[in-house]
């Protein structure tokens, strides 16, 4: 409920306006029926005056005008609440603990957010607000006006409510099981769809698409079949209510004919008021069923929103030192049962150019993520300058660190946005930097130039172009520590050599840490650190290691082959 309360508070004024309008409109709708009784009886006994007709006309005018005005807060809240829940998910991603984020599959997460946002909107808007401003006031006013006409009919009404309650509980049991199956099938379907979209080449070349499409079709059939069943049960509610109202309508006509106690106007009013009294009950049962089902989707969404945050992003000390000087002592890191870094110690001086080299799974990337504060170490000490990493505010740290991963951190936007984000930089400066990374031809050959959209994850660019565009961003960042995690792996040897020469010239006064598998690219680094099974097993210059370290020679020879 915490997040629902948060969104209610955010939209507080419009919620109050919406509830107020709903209660007023419910009263006017029922009062209109009550007054219509007087008009009919006035016509029947020829006592109707012009004032009565004019008053009824005014009531109709108010009713229709207020219903029209009601659309504004209704749509504002309906769409706003849904998007507010989606914004909550984006805010969550911005502060979520990195290890929790790693456990989430993109396809399932997208479906969970989509379903959860819609469910949150339905719980708050379609159920609670509908109940408070529409259903309860309409039932209350209807019963009051029915009681004014004939108390006995009111008692019959309550008997009908009891029948409905029993019927509802029977149907609900079936609906819960069906909805749970739909949720699981939708997440599975989205998992297959996203996997197919993201891994097109892998599945095409391995001829896996027929199998993937078959699995997706099976999930689709389950969803369609379950939704049809659910819809039929929903419609059963309305059919039962329609039959019950029909029985009551006939009963009122029979009662009026037999007792002669009701006027024509009273009969007409009772029939209309009974429909007013029962329609909200029919609606309530349907939205209550949906509410219970939506709670299952919303619970999954809440579980995501409730995942552990990285509190260090906002908490901690402001940095008052150069983070390019690093001291690591007896560092250990364990993920679940696996020890990835074991008693590691390392010192890096300000401005030093360091390369991490080793087999896959030797701990290089894990150490990088620890230095970035993404992973929290179990034992040991990591000092940036003269400050312990655990005590630093990470948002403050990220102002001083540049990080480029192997996956080329470019995003769906323009070339300009990928270069400078929202910074104000002249076009000449940007073009100059693109020349440094051998990308000027890209802009010159495009009609939109720097404003060209590069597509999701840079799909309009080659792997090497994406990496060069990401590297160009370094020219516009005022960092003290630069970390490159195989940031040139998609480039050819000649391009990599020329681009890295420009990058290292630009970074000459900064500390640079690079992970590399292509060892010739780090030949000019001050020091190379060798990793194996979570430990440092050697270090030195490229030439020293090439002639004295058998492990490095094995890595180099394997790389050359």
Q: What is the predicted role of each segment?
A:
Residues 73, 79, 87-117, 192-215, ...:
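Short intracellular "coupling" helices and adjacent cytoplasmic loop segments at the cytosolic face
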Residues 12-69, 73, 146-154, 264:
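Transmembrane helix-loop-helix hairpins at lipid-water interfaces of multipass membrane proteins
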Residues 321-561:
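ABC-type nucleotide-binding domain
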Residues 27-37, 128-172, 228-271:
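A hydrophobic transmembrane-helix motif
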Residues 1-10, 109:
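A short amphipathic helical element positioned immediately N-terminal to and/or at the very start
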Residues 208, 232, 276-306:
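Cytosolic ends of transmembrane helices, especially the final helix of ABC transmembrane type-1 domains
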Residues 98-99, 115-128, 132, 136, ...:
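An intracellular "coupling" helix at the cytosolic face of ABC transporter transmembrane type-1 domains
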Residues 58-62, 193, 267-287:
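Hydrophobic transmembrane alpha-helices
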């Amino acid at each position: 409920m915490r997040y629902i309360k948060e969104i209610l508070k955010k939209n507080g004024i419009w919620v109050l306006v919406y509830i107020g309008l709903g209660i007023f409109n419910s009263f006017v709708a029922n009062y209109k029926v009550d007054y219509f009784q007087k008009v009919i009886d006035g016509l029947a006994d020829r006592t109707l005056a012009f004032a009565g007709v004019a008053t009824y006309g005014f009531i109709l005018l108010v009713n229709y005008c207020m219903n029209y005005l009601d659309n504004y807060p209704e749509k504002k809240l309906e769409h706003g609440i849904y998007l507010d829940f989606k914004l909550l998910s984006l805010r969550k991603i911005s502060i979520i603990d990195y290890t929790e984020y790693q456990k989430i599959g993109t396809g399932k997460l997208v479906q969970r957010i989509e379903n959860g946002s819609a469910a949150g909107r339905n719980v708050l808007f379609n159920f609670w607000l509908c109940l408070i401003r529409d259903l309860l006031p309409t039932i209350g006013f209807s019963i009051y006006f029915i009681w004014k006409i004939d108390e006995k009919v009111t008692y019959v009404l309550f008997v009908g409510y009891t029948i409905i309650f029993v019927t509802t509980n029977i149907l609900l049991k079936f609906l819960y099981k069906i909805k749970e199956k739909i949720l699981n099938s939708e997440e599975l379907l989205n998992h297959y769809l996203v996997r197919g979209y993201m891994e097109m080449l892998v599945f095409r070349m391995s001829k896996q698409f027929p199998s993937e499409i078959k699995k997706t079709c099976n999930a689709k059939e389950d969803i369609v079949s379950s939704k049809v069943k659910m819809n039929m049960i929903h419609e059963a509610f309305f059919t039962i209510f329609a039959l019950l109202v029909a029985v009551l309508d006939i009963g009122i006509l029979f009662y009026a004919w037999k007792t002669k106690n009701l006027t024509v106007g009273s009969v007409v009013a009772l029939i209309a008021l009974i429909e007013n009294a029962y329609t909200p009950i029919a609606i309530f049962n349907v939205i209550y069923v949906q509410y219970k089902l939506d709670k299952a989707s919303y619970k999954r969404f809440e579980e995501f929103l409730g995942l552990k945050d990285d509190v260090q992003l906002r908490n901690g000390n402001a940095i008052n030192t150069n983070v390019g000087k690093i001291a690591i002592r007896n560092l250990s890191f364990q993920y679940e049962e696996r020890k990835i870094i074991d008693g590691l110690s390392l010192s890096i001086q300000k401005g030093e150019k360091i390369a991490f080299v080793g087999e896959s799974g030797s701990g290089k990337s894990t150490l990088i993520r620890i230095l970035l504060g993404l992973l929290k170490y179990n034992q040991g000490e990591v000092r940036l300058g003269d400050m312990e990493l655990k005590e630093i505010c990470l948002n403050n740290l990220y102002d001083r660190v540049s990080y480029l991963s192997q996956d080329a951190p470019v995003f769906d936007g323009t070339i300009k946005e990928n270069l400078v984000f929202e910074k104000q930089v002249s076009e000449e400066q940007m073009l100059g930097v693109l020349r440094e990374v051998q990308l000027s031809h890209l802009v010159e050959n495009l009609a939109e130039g720097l404003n060209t959209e590069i597509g999701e994850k840079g799909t309009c660019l080659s792997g090497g172009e994406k990496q060069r565009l990401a590297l160009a961003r370094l020219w516009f960042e005022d960092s003290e520590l630069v970390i490159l995690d195989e940031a040139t792996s998609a480039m050819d040897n000649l391009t990599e050599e020329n681009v890295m020469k420009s990058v290292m010239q630009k970074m000459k006064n900064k500390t640079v840490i690079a992970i590399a598998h292509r060892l010739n690219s780090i030949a000019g680094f001050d020091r190379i650190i060798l990793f194996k099974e979570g430990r440092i097993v050697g270090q030195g210059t490229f030439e020293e290691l090439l002639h004295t370290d058998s492990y490095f020679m094995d890595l180099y020879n394997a790389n050359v082959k």
